[in-house]
Structures are given as structure tokens and as C-alpha cells.
Amino acid sequence: MDSDSCAAAFHPEEYSPSCKRRRTVEDFNKFCTFVLAYAGYIPYPKEELPLRSSPSPANSTAGTIDSDGWDAGFSDIASSVPLPVSDRCFSHLQPTLLQRAKPSNFLLDRKKTDKLKKKKKRKRRDSDAPGKEGYRGGLLKLEAADPYVETPTSPTLQDIPQAPSDPCSGWDSDTPSSGSCATVSPDQVKEIKTEGKRTIVRQGKQVVFRDEDSTGNDEDIMVDSDDDSWDLVTCFCMKPFAGRPMIECNECHTWIHLSCAKIRKSNVPEVFVCQKCRDSKFDIRRSNRSRTGSRKLFLD
């Protein structure tokens, strides 16, 4: 079926789906421009306003609208002159597409704003760096200029006279003393310091630690470093007495540190036998057993 018979038969009243007109390049370009304008990528031409207001839009299969209607809507495009190959690729629509796409591309705008924010932050850091260095230098100067300020003591300790060059210090019951106090006569008893529930009392060359109960069982007596027995070595650990609490063995009469004997100050036994004496007794028993066993074998 040729194009003349198809054009003659292409009327709304006498339309049959079997008769179709061949579409040309101009028809395809017109259709594409209409679709782009309908999607909002390019502005509508002035002649196309009645087409857009029509209730039934153009079909993508291109079978319901006559070519005469397209020519009336787009009279500026010459139908007799074929479009070049470059027009088929829609190169003439690229500038308008770019102009319409630039405002809607928010990703590029975000990248630009992020770069600007980073630049501002760098400028702020560079401007704040010399100020911080000057502030640190000022703090160092103030620390070097300020004298050492001692912490104020309690009113009960301020009334106690102390030696200016060699202040008194309280000893821990298990650690050797590092300082010495001014000598006091044996008859005088002076309260030196109060630490929580424990009171440190000095009696001549002895320092007594008393709890709140002030019972004799809770006292820890320590000897001052001025005593001759301070550097005396009696314990098997080969360390001096050094004011630490010790206990005497009932067998060999040697003084042993409570920490070396693994005895707590709150649980000191009345009778103590050191480990060496225990081992010697055990060896004697073993030797006696071996002797009696050998005698029995010899007699048998």
C-alpha cells in the first residue's frame, strides 16, 4: 500500500488500524521536542499551548495525530529540507538542557559549599594558632613566676611546735622511716599527728600508733632512727630492723620481721617458732625414724 492511498485514507472518520503512514526524521524530531518540552527540559513554543491543554496527550506509538496538525504547530521547521546528521543527535538541544540542568544539580553546589567551609576552617585555625601559642607562653611564665604555696594545715596541727629544718613525719607500720624528729625527753609524751582513726604519739625514741579505741592491743610501737638497733640485722632476709615490727622466736631467740614471718599485726601469736627451727625439728624426726628403721632391720 503506497503513501498516497494511506494519506487519503488517514481521516478521523475513516481511520483503520491496518493503514499506517511512514514516519520521517522530521516527525521524529518533532515528537522528541514535544516530549522534552512536556518533561520540562525545554520551554514550550507559543504554538504548542493548545496541544498541551488537550485532554489526550500524543501517543508514543505515533498513530493518532495527522502530519498536518504537526505542521501547523511547528511551522518554523522546514519540512522539505531534511535535517543533517548532527540534528538527529539533538546537538542543538544541548545548550538548553545544560541551562535547565545547572540549577537543579544540587550535588555540585554541595561540593562547592563544602570546599568553602573547609577553606574557612583552615583560615580560622591559622589565625588561632599564634594566639594559642602566646596563651601557653603566658601560662608558662605565670607558673615560673608564682612561688610554691604550701597547703594550709589544720588548726590543731598549727599549735604544735616543730623543728624548722627537720619536720616530723608519721611512719607507716610496714615501711621504714625517711625522716627524724626532734629529740624529746622520755618523761614527755607528745601528740604529733592525727590521721583518720589513727593517732601518732611520740614517747622518747619510740613512736606509738594508736587507734580510736586507745587499747594496748592496737598499738604499734616503733623505734626512732637515732636508736642503735635501727641498723641491726637479725632477720633471715638480711635487712635491718629499720623500725619495722618484729617478733622473737622462742627456740633460737632471733628477731624476725612480721612481714617475713607472714604474720598480721592484728593476729600476733603468743608463742612463735621460726621456719628454720621447724625445719630442723622435722629433719631430726626424719633422722630418728631412719635410725630406728635401720636398727629394726639389723636386729631382724
Curated annotation (Swiss-Prot):
<keyword id="KW-0226">DNA condensation</keyword>
<feature type="compositionally biased region" description="Polar residues">
    <location>
        <begin position="172"/>
        <end position="185"/>
    </location>
</feature>
<feature type="zinc finger region" description="PHD-type">
    <location>
        <begin position="232"/>
        <end position="280"/>
    </location>
</feature>
<dbReference type="InterPro" id="IPR041947">
    <property type="entry name" value="PHD_PHF13"/>
</dbReference>
<dbReference type="Pfam" id="PF20826">
    <property type="entry name" value="PHD_5"/>
</dbReference>
<dbReference type="GO" id="GO:0062072">
    <property type="term" value="F:histone H3K9me2/3 reader activity"/>
</dbReference>
<dbReference type="InterPro" id="IPR013083">
    <property type="entry name" value="Znf_RING/FYVE/PHD"/>
</dbReference>
<dbReference type="GO" id="GO:0003682">
    <property type="term" value="F:chromatin binding"/>
</dbReference>
<keyword id="KW-0498">Mitosis</keyword>
<keyword id="KW-0156">Chromatin regulator</keyword>
<dbReference type="GO" id="GO:0005634">
    <property type="term" value="C:nucleus"/>
</dbReference>
<feature type="compositionally biased region" description="Basic and acidic residues">
    <location>
        <begin position="125"/>
        <end position="135"/>
    </location>
</feature>
<dbReference type="InterPro" id="IPR011011">
    <property type="entry name" value="Znf_FYVE_PHD"/>
</dbReference>
<keyword id="KW-0132">Cell division</keyword>
<dbReference type="GO" id="GO:0140463">
    <property type="term" value="F:chromatin-protein adaptor activity"/>
</dbReference>
<dbReference type="GO" id="GO:0035064">
    <property type="term" value="F:methylated histone binding"/>
</dbReference>
<dbReference type="GO" id="GO:0005654">
    <property type="term" value="C:nucleoplasm"/>
</dbReference>
<dbReference type="GO" id="GO:0007059">
    <property type="term" value="P:chromosome segregation"/>
</dbReference>
<feature type="short sequence motif" description="Nuclear localization signal">
    <location>
        <begin position="110"/>
        <end position="127"/>
    </location>
</feature>
<dbReference type="GO" id="GO:0007076">
    <property type="term" value="P:mitotic chromosome condensation"/>
</dbReference>
<comment type="subunit">
    <text>Interacts with histone H3 that is trimethylated at 'Lys-4' (H3K4me3). Interacts with GSK3B. Interacts with TRIM28. Interacts with SETDB1; the interaction probably enhances SETDB1 chromatin-associated levels and activity.</text>
</comment>
<comment type="function">
    <text>Modulates chromatin structure and DNA damage response by regulating key determinants of chromatin compaction and DNA damage response. Binds H3K4me3-containing chromatin and promotes DNA condensation by recruiting corepressors such as TRIM28 and H3K9 methyltransferase SETDB1. Required for normal chromosome condensation during the early stages of mitosis. Required for normal chromosome separation during mitosis. Increases both chromatin-associated levels and activity of H3K9 methyltransferases, such as SETDB1, thus enhancing H3K9 trimethylation.</text>
</comment>
<dbReference type="InterPro" id="IPR001965">
    <property type="entry name" value="Znf_PHD"/>
</dbReference>
<keyword id="KW-0863">Zinc-finger</keyword>
<feature type="region of interest" description="Interaction with trimethylated histone H3 (H3K4)">
    <location>
        <begin position="241"/>
        <end position="248"/>
    </location>
</feature>
<keyword id="KW-0479">Metal-binding</keyword>
<keyword id="KW-0539">Nucleus</keyword>
<dbReference type="GO" id="GO:0008270">
    <property type="term" value="F:zinc ion binding"/>
</dbReference>
<dbReference type="GO" id="GO:0051301">
    <property type="term" value="P:cell division"/>
</dbReference>
<keyword id="KW-0131">Cell cycle</keyword>
<dbReference type="GO" id="GO:0000278">
    <property type="term" value="P:mitotic cell cycle"/>
</dbReference>
<keyword id="KW-0862">Zinc</keyword>
<dbReference type="GO" id="GO:0006974">
    <property type="term" value="P:DNA damage response"/>
</dbReference>
<protein>
    <recommendedName>
        <fullName>PHD finger protein 13</fullName>
    </recommendedName>
</protein>
<feature type="region of interest" description="Disordered">
    <location>
        <begin position="109"/>
        <end position="185"/>
    </location>
</feature>
<feature type="compositionally biased region" description="Basic residues">
    <location>
        <begin position="113"/>
        <end position="124"/>
    </location>
</feature>
